Amino acid sequence: RVFAPSEDKFEEVDTGNSERSLRYRRAYQVAKGAVGPQVGTVRRKLERVMMSQAQTFWEGGKRSGRLDVRRNSKKIVELRPDVFRRRQEESAVNTALSILVDMSGSMSSSKIFMAQRATIAICEALDGMRVPLEVLGHHTAASSAMQDAWYRLPQDRRKMVSRVQSIDMHLFKGFDEPLSMARAKLGRMTQMTDGANADGDAIVMAAKRLMARREPRKVMLVLSDGEPAYTGYNRNIHNHTRDCVKWVGENGIEIAGLGIMSASVTKYYDRVVVVNKIEDFATTYIDEVAKLLTGRSLST
């Protein structure tokens, strides 16, 4: 059957039984170890920037804390319990972050390992900073039956089909999911590359989830090794990808492309970082993430 939008799939990554889950957790730890030195440095830098922007205030009417004599002298005389105040800190980063990883066949081998490590570096650096973070991966589903059905269509009807393959969207970590619960799923990422990449449609799918968040600032990072590639007819897939990126921006999402050993992302995104080796994380990649989250460079 020729593709219909309802055939796109959204599924949480399955880590299987306890033995497989343990194996994926070990894979995560290996990847984390590869970026460990950078993660520690980046976390300290991010914390410094965020703390400098945080707003601190005192909230009264508490039953414990510091005695608020100035505002509650009458209540103190009356022996009321709500005469204390507590120091509250409002996070400087009221931002939700979505990371979308191209997991097509061309990303196999060293590229998906680098994408996994880049993703883990961000997850670990932001862990504990109260930044809602979602990690998604996408590729098309290979189906010879759908492809054959498309080719059997009359030429005029074939031109009406913009995309033959459906999209498989994998959830590695939810916005409100603790990182500790997602590590096994992220550890499996390197084993899941397949098919092609319908970047534009996948970006829109991820963006709609991000748009549902209540945080005033929304940021999306798209990790990819190249250009979109999938079967279709009535669509210029390159222009379509650019149109989707533009639509995301018009709907209040700041979007950036991270090129994995490729500069092709420069064709589709205004904000771009190209990473060719793991050592680039602590400079180019992480600094761009910091600027997106805080509006400031880590070097400031």
Where do the model's predicted regions map?
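Acidic, glycine-rich A-domain
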Residues: 1-300
